[in-house]
């Protein structure tokens, strides 16, 4: 049974008809305007950046920026912080000054500073522990006289760390440890605030080393502390400016890759200053490496590939804290997860967590996603890549770009096709495609973001490590690699507990005596495995 047409109220029918005519006229007028607007063509780069050799001056153009903008850069573009010429001119060829007249920096666009400042302020809201440390120690200025040269990811979270170091009395010069992880607007905000920062998203390898060199090689300014992430800064100083180490009081290193390089130097007797291994501190291993990766692996994969995880077969290479975080997230969304491991202890942990431990060769033909988390080199070789199924996704959650043999894919018979920012299709002669993310570099910071609160824990640990090394009396630390004192780990954790309204139980005198502990800690021996 059909319903009768609705009857308009008396006197309203003609008004509705006129309103409809006006609405139609406006709609067609708008459509005509849209039709006349010229269509913008997406520009794809003809040549891929070759990272096996230093490019020429004309080869310094940002690869990622010439193709597509990151999620954060799109906001700044919409707010008219950038113009089309920014993608054509290398920051090294620009003459920029901040509002104070200083040009002691090199960033993508200093006009992005206002937007970057808002990003930093947002990050500060979830980094209350670092802000608390800044307020507690600001009067004492424990880093007064410190000249810190840093090479880390330059994000809103690390900007909070850098500005905390400055508030505690340090002078800082900074570069990026990854060519894709810099937030341009944040770098601009730091430059506007007076920090000598040399970094932008999409640097070439030549740019990367140039930025590090500008931080170290400065007339009238010599660093006495190093904060490194990956060991590239430390390597550059050893290679180019070994005399700088005469004034360096210590190195703080936060990544497994950089720590490995420090231990190699120590073993060879070439480590000439004390170094603090932040990566293996409890507050880095058990929080940043685990929880940060558990959340950011999914974010990075979703943003780049729109992949559905349920039912997908995924192999994760390495079951350390990073691997554990990745596997937990993938398993929770229904992925079928395999593990590769060299360590029988980690392998047994994987088995008891419900994962199959396999050799990569055994599953490489069937898996949909390959993730590396080892800190090693050539974990995924050209042979593995040749045997992968069509549309297999390959990415890295370790620090450096050595885990996947990307260099072996730069051959004439393979075609590279950039399909979106940080996503390349590598096409074999038979038409097979492998989806390579961030050119084998760190997925989460290259393609997405990471949880601010977790980074607050790591940043606070780094700040305390710098304070400890800088103020340590002569002789406390020798030319070796050290772990952060347990008491400092506990202090970092205690600063973050108020965010959860958590309240610690206090030992009685009798209980403390029974356990042989100080009531105020440390509560665990150095050999304790959390």
From Swiss-Prot:
Changing residue 85 to A: Slightly decreases interaction with ITPR1. No effect on phosphorylation. No effect on interaction with SLC4A4. Decreases interaction with FIP1L1. This is S-adenosylhomocysteine hydrolase-like protein 1. One of its GO terms (biological process) is protein export from nucleus. Its cofactor is NAD(+). Changing residue 97 to A: No effect on interaction with ITPR1. No effect on interaction with SLC4A4. No effect on interaction with FIP1L1. NAD(+) binds at residues 318-322, 341, 376, 397-399. Changing residue 77 to A: Highly decreases interaction with ITPR1. Slightly decreases phosphorylation. Strongly decreases interaction with SLC4A4. Abolishes interaction with FIP1L1. Phosphorylated at Ser/Thr residues between Ser-68 and Thr-72 in the PEST region: required for interaction with dATP-bound RRM1 and ITPR1. Phosphorylation at Ser-68 by PRKD1 and CAMK4 is required for further phosphorylations by CSNK1A1. Phosphorylation is induced by oxidative stress. Probably phosphorylated by CAMK2A; phosphorylation at Ser-68 may be required for interaction with SLC9A3. Dephosphorylated in response to apoptotic stress conditions which causes translocation of both AHCYL1 and BCL2L10 from mitochondria-associated endoplasmic reticulum membranes and promotes apoptosis. The gene is AHCYL1. Expressed in dendritic cells.
């Amino acid at each position: 049974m059909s319903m009768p047409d609705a009857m308009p109220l008396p006197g309203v029918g003609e008004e509705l008809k006129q309103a409809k005519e006006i609405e139609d006229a406006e709609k067609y007028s708008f459509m005509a305007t849209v039709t006349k607007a010229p269509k913008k063509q997406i520009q794809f780069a003809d040549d891929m950046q070759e990272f096996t050799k230093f490019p020429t001056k004309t080869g310094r153009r940002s690869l990622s920026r010439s193709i597509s903008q990151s999620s954060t850069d799109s906001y700044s573009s919409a707010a008219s912080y950038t113009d089309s010429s920014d993608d054509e001119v290398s920051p090294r060829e620009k003459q920029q000054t901040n509002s104070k007249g200083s040009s002691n920096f090199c960033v993508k666009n200093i006009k992005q500073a206002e937007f970057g400042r808002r990003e930093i302020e947002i990050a500060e809201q979830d980094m209350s522990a670092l802000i608390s440390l800044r307020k507690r120690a600001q009067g004492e200025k424990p880093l007064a006289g410190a000249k810190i040269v840093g090479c880390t990811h330059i994000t809103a979270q690390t900007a909070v760390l850098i500005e905390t170091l400055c508030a505690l009395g340090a002078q800082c010069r900074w570069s990026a440890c990854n060519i894709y992880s810099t937030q341009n607007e944040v770098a601009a905000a730091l430059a506007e605030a007076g920090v000598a920062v040399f970094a932008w998203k999409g640097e070439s390898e030549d740019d990367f080393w140039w930025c590090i060199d500008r931080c170290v090689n400065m007339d009238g300014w010599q660093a006495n502390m190093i904060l490194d992430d990956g060991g590239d800064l430390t390597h550059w100083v050893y290679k180019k400016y070994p005399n700088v180490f005469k004034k360096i009081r210590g190195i703080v290193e936060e990544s497994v890759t950089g720590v490995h390089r420090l231990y190699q130097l120590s073993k060879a007797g070439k480590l000439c200053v004390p170094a603090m291994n932040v990566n293996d501190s409890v507050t880095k291993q058990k929080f940043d490496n685990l929880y940060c990766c558990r959340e950011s692996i999914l974010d990075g994969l979703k943003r780049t590939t729109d992949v559905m995880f349920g039912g997908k077969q995924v192999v994760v290479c390495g079951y350390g804290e990073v691997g554990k975080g990745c596997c937990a997230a993938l398993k929770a969304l229904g992925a079928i997860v395999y593990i590769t491991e060299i360590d029988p202890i980690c392998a047994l942990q994987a088995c008891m967590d419900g994962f199959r431990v396999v050799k990569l060769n055994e599953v490489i033909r069937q898996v949909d996603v390959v993730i590396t988390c080892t800190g090693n080199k050539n974990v995924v070789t050209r042979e593995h890549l040749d045997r992968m199924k069509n549309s297999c996704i390959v990415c890295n959650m370790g620090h450096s770009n050595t885990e996947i043999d990307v260099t072996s894919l730069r051959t004439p018979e393979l075609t590279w096709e950039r399909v979106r920012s940080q996503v390349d299709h590598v096409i074999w002669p038979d038409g097979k495609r492998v989806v390579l993310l961030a050119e084998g570099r760190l997925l989460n910071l290259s393609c997405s973001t990471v949880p601010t609160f977790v980074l607050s824990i790591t940043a606070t640990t780094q700040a305390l490590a710098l304070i400890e090394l800088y103020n340590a009396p002569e002789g406390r630390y020798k030319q070796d690699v050290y772990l952060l004192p347990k008491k400092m780990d506990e202090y970092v954790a205690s600063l973050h507990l108020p965010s959860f309204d958590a309240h610690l139980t206090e030992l009685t005198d009798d209980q403390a005596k029974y356990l042989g502990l100080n009531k105020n800690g440390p509560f665990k021996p150095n050999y304790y495995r959390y």
